[in-house]
Regions:
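Active-site environment of divalent metal-dependent phosphoester hydrolases
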Residues: 35-37, 68-71, 101-104, 127, ...
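Hydrophobic faces of well-ordered beta-strands that scaffold small-molecule active sites
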Residues: 27-32, 61-64, 93-97, 120-122, ...
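Catalytic pocket-lining loop regions of alpha/beta-barrel enzymes
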Residues: 3-10, 14, 119, 133-224, ...
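Divalent metal-dependent hydrolysis catalytic cores, especially in the metallo-beta-lactamase
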Residues: 30-33, 37-39, 43-71, 92-100, ...
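Acidic (Asp/Glu)-rich catalytic clusters
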Residues: 19-24, 48-58, 78-92, 107-117, ...
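Conserved, mostly hydrophobic/aromatic
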Residues: 31, 52, 82, 86, ...
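Mid-to-C-terminal alpha-helical segments outside catalytic/metal-binding sites
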Residues: 1-26, 30, 49-52, 57-60, ...
Length: 380
């Protein structure tokens, strides 16, 4: 296997991850993909393992199919590929079966669970379904009977998701992973499912403010690290998750829960640790200079992702230029060190973006990391 080298600019992110996490070999990425998507994204086994190796040679991941053109009938072919890839990964990958509620989901789910699938993936936007249906209820019954978690897309493109909360309340024994921090309806989920014993939220979120708000509303014991490969990178996602976790006041054992131990428990059929109260205040002071830089970076990221997969890193660069102008402030005050670090990451992102589309996600990862620093630095 050829390990993709970590771009030099990621070295400071990698160093901070080392400071914030004692055992990187225990990292478990809750949300990765393999195969081909209709949007053009693709990822093969060796490259996924290479991305995990950038974290640690022992890092692991949950994995499932993309919105594969070969998904009919019943996602059978993509599910078989994922099962085979996981078997070849020597214990580093936990395969989930992807199901379409409109295409024989129970028979396919039973088949995959019998072959070793460790969970179920549902994507209500891609498969255009709701949760107030007999098929959705039957899938929850399947997960309950099989003792496996369900990971559900709860990010962009979704309407209000109260029907899913209703279903979760009817099945308290089913472990749910709400992907993308449940940003489609985060406040509703955090309120209505606060007492659910096994609902967790993954951290594959592009906005640092959504991630901070997740830690402000949800106990640390209910948050699990995720990168959404191939749309993200584990090392960048882990940096963002751990930095926000530290900002939220999590100590080393709590950060270890987020990085892998909580997801390990769900996969083993155990309840996550008892929840503690979030410690991030609802109202938080910000440094105006860092807020300006961070706002430009969020706008740039939206422009890049709005271009459609694969993302166009060149579209973020006008906003990067504005953020770098903020970083050149001749009187930066207490924000000076953070602005200097942000400027270094953005300069490296410009260099990667100039190398072409193969480096686009690495460039965008650096922009995201810079945004996380802007949002979490404690300068006043």
């Amino acid at each position: 296997m050829v390990v993709e080298p970590l771009p030099e600019a990621f070295a400071t992110l990698d160093a901070e991850v080392r400071e914030l996490l004692d055992d990187r070999s225990a990292v478990l990425d809750a949300h990765t993909h393999l195969g081909l998507d209709e949007d053009g994204q693709t990822l093969e086994l060796d490259r996924l393992l290479g991305f995990l190796d950038q974290v640690d040679a022992g890092a692991r991941a949950c994995v499932f199919a993309l919105h594969d053109p070969d998904r009919r009938p019943a996602y059978r072919t993509p599910n078989d590929r994922v099962l085979a890839w996981a078997a070849a990964a020597e214990g580093r990958l936990y395969p989930f079966c992807r199901l379409d509620p409109a295409d024989d989901p129970i028979a396919e789910g039973k088949r995959c669970l019998a072959l070793g699938a460790r969970g179920i993936k549902l994507h209500p936007r891609a498969q255009a379904f709701g949760f107030d249906t007999p098929a959705a209820k039957a899938i929850f019954e399947l997960a309950r009977d099989g003792g496996v978690p369900i990971l559900i897309h709860a990010g962009r493109g979704m309407p209000p998701m109260d029907a899913l909360a209703d279903l979760a309340q009817r099945f308290p024994e089913v472990a749910l992973v709400l992907a993308h921090g449940a940003i489609a309806d985060q406040a509703m989920f955090a309120t209505r499912l606060a007492g659910h014993p096994a609902v967790v939220y993954d951290t594959s979120i592009f906005s640092p403010f959504d991630l901070i708000e997740l830690f402000a509303r949800v106990p640390a014991e209910r948050i699990v690290f995720a990168s959404d490969v191939p749309y993200g990178r584990p090392i960048a996602g882990l940096f963002a998750t751990l930095r926000v976790a530290a900002y939220a006041g999590l100590d080393a054992p709590e950060r270890a829960l987020v990085a892998g131990a909580t997801m390990d428990a769900l996969l083993a059929g155990r309840a996550p640790a008892a929840p503690t109260a979030p410690r991030v205040p609802a109202v938080r002071a910000v440094n105006g200079r860092l807020a300006r830089a961070g706002a430009y970076l969020l706008m740039g990221f939206g422009a890049a992702m709005g271009s459609g997969p694969p993302p166009d890193a060149t579209r973020v660069m006008p906003m990067v230029a504005l953020a770098r102008a903020v970083c050149r402030d001749p009187d930066p005050g207490a924000a000076g060190p953070a602005l200097g670090r942000i400027d270094g990451l953005l300069a490296a992102a410009e260099g990667l973006a100039a190398q072409g589309s193969d480096r686009a996600l690495a460039a965008i990862g650096l922009v995201m990391a810079a945004g996380v620093i802007a949002a979490t630095d404690q300068s006043r």
